[in-house]
C-alpha cells in the first residue's frame, strides 16, 4: 500500500511514475531502505528502539531532504507565473516568427518613430553634456489667476439632482439634457420608479440608465409596458443584474417578432443573471441591432456570442470580463463580421497573440476602437498586428499589459497615425519611447492616459507639450512621480485646449505648479478638493 501522509501524497502527485509503497523496501523516498513494517508506526508497532513511531517524524530526516527540495522546486515552478513581474531589460517576446528579433532591430530612419527617437536621443545626449542647462525653461507665472467658477449648467443640474425626489415631470426638457439628469440621478443613487415613469413617458428614442441596481424586476417590467418602444434606437440598462433575469428581458423583447424594429444600440453591462437563452430572443426582436454591450455578464458563453454573430450584422461588440467566453471559439464568427468596428475584450484570459493577429488580418481595416486591457497573454507581436492592419483606429486601450516593450510603441506610431484616445496605464514603456511615439503620431490625440508608468519624465513632458498641444483635452498623469512642477507647468501652459488633468498619487507636486501655471481652462483632479464632485463636474 501507499503512504497517506501529506508529503507522500504531494510526492505522488508531482512524480506519478515513482512506484513507492510503504510495504516495499528500498523504495519509500523518506524511509530509506527499510519498509514501514521494519520501522513501525503504521499500526501501533514499535520502532527500532522499542518506542512507538510516527511516520511523520521521519519527514525531518536527511534521507528524504533531496526529494523535498525537488518537490518544493516543482511547486515553485508551477506557481511562479502568478507572481512574476516582467522587466523590459530582460524580457524576450516568445514569438513564432524566427526573424522577429532581426526585424525589430532594423534601423528605419525614414519612419516617423525612428526619426523622432533619433531626435530625442540627441536631446538626451545634449542634456548629459550640459547638466546645468535648463531642461524645459518653464517659470511659474507671477500673475494671480482668478478662481474659475463652476459652469452654471453644472450648478443647476447638481441642485436638481440634490432634490431629485421633488421632480414632478421631465416634459419639455430637451432630450440630451434629460439624459444627463437621469444619468446623474443614477450615479447619485437618487433614481426611483416615479422618475423612471416620467422619463419614459412620451415618444423617447433613447433610454440611458447607467445604474439599475436600485430597481426591482416589477419596476422594469412596468416601465417598459407603458413605454412606446417602436421608436427606441438606444437602450442602456447597465448594472441590471438584480432586476434583469432571463424572463424579464424575454417579457420586454418578446411582445412580437419585431417588437424593437428601430433598436440599434443595446447595453446590458453587469446583467449577471442573463444566459444565452435570452440572446436569441433579442436577436429576433431587434433585427437592426448593431451594437451590444454584454460586459460582466458572467453567465454568457461562447455559444451565445456565436449565435448573435450569425443572426445580426453587428458593428460593435463589448464582452469585457465574461469568464465563460473563450475568444478562440468565437474567433471564426468574429472573422466573418466584415463590418466590425468596435471590439472590447478587456479582462478575457483567453485573448492571445494568435487571436489578435488573425482578427486584425480579417477585420483590422474597418476597426475603429479596440480594448484589450488586462489581457495578460498579449505581447508586442499583437501590437505589431494592430499597427500593420488598423490604419483607421481611433481608440486603443492597452492598460496593464506588462509583456509589452518599447517596440510596441514603434509599431503603433508607424501604423496608427489618427488615434484620438490612447490608454497605456501601468505599462513598462521607457520615457524616450513614449516621447518618440507622441512626437511622431500624437498630434490627433484628444485623450491620453499614462497613469502609473514609472519611467515617464521630462522627455514625455516635452513631447506632450510639442506633439499633442493642438487637440489634447484629457490627460491622466496619476502616479507619475518623476514629473516635476516644471514639467507639469510646461505641459499645461503649452496645451491650450487641455481641460482635465488627473494627478492622483502625485505627492511631489507643490503649490509652485498649482498656482503658477497660466492655463485658466484646465481642471486639476486628484490633488485637493472633493474628488467625487470634480469627477461629476467633468461629466457635464
Question: What are these regions, as identified by a protein language model?
Answer:
Residues 1-10, 526-540:
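Extreme C-terminal disordered tails of eukaryotic proteins encode short linear targeting/docking signals used
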Residues 2-225, 232-236:
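Cullin-RING E3 adaptor/co-adaptor recruitment helices
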Residues 186-293, 302, 316, 328, ...:
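Leucine-rich repeat
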Residues 187-193, 213-221, 243-251, 272-277, ...:
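Short, solvent-exposed loop/turn at the beta-strand->alpha-helix junction
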Residues 210, 240, 269, 295, ...:
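The repeat-register position in solenoid repeat domains
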Residues 223, 513-520:
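Short, aromatic/basic amphipathic alpha-helical patches
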